[in-house]
Amino acid sequence: MARYTGPKTKIARKFGEAIFGDDKSFEKRNYPPGQHGNNRRRGKKSEYAIQLMEKQKAKYTYGILERQFRNMFEKATRAQGITGEVLLQLCESRLDNVVYRMGVAPSRRAARQLVGHRHITVNGELVNIPSYHLKAGDVVGVREKSKSLAVVQESLSNNSSVYEWISWNSEKKEGTFVAVPGRVQIPENINEQFIVELYSK
């Protein structure tokens, strides 16, 4: 499956929540997409359908393809800790996600573009791999000649989110990935246990 690049609101309506962040269009039409979406009754889903839906929600939320997501799950099963929580922690530790969490980009999709176009550094070195996994203490910054980019300045000026596991220096336009977040520090509405059950079949 290729990475989805279509209308975000349509996907958000599929899951019944604004999984990509603030979405005024979703607020106006928070019912399933389709001709009869506003009047359609949501039938009772099977256990498999619920588990699959949760996996799809996580993949769309973080913008991760199936092979990458499956590999991350396998890595989570080998790590210490609760598999589902470790999976979400791996998602949160990706460079594109941290760039988004720091407020450098208005969305994960925009964060991936910034990383891919070589606007982001890790510990002073250019890194253009969105899936790069950060370690505690890593410093993520905006490349010097990219600090004046309109998308970066506008995103930072509109950002009001604060996360305990990330620090940010507004003057240097760089932040530190202080620690891997605990489950309670991850705001996404994802039931990771359903994903574990699906992959464990």
Curated annotation (Swiss-Prot):
Keywords: Ribonucleoprotein, Ribosomal protein, RNA-binding, rRNA-binding
Region (Disordered): 26-45
Family that this chain belongs to: Belongs to the universal ribosomal protein uS4 family.
Quaternary structure, from the entry: Part of the 30S ribosomal subunit. Contacts protein S5. The interaction surface between S4 and S5 is involved in control of translational fidelity.
Keyword rRNA-binding: yes
Organism in which the protein naturally occurs: Christiangramia forsetii (strain DSM 17595 / CGMCC 1.15422 / KT0803) (Gramella forsetii)
GO molecular function: rRNA binding; structural constituent of ribosome
Gene Ontology biological process terms in this record: ribosomal small subunit biogenesis; translation
Entries under SMART domains matching the protein: Ribosomal_S4, S4
Domain named S4 RNA-binding: residues: 93-153
Role summary: One of the primary rRNA binding proteins, it binds directly to 16S rRNA where it nucleates assembly of the body of the 30S subunit. With S5 and S12 plays an important role in translational accuracy.
One GO cellular component term noted in the UniProt record for this chain: small ribosomal subunit
Superkingdom assignment: Bacteria
Protein name in the entry: Small ribosomal subunit protein uS4
Gene designation per UniProt: rpsD
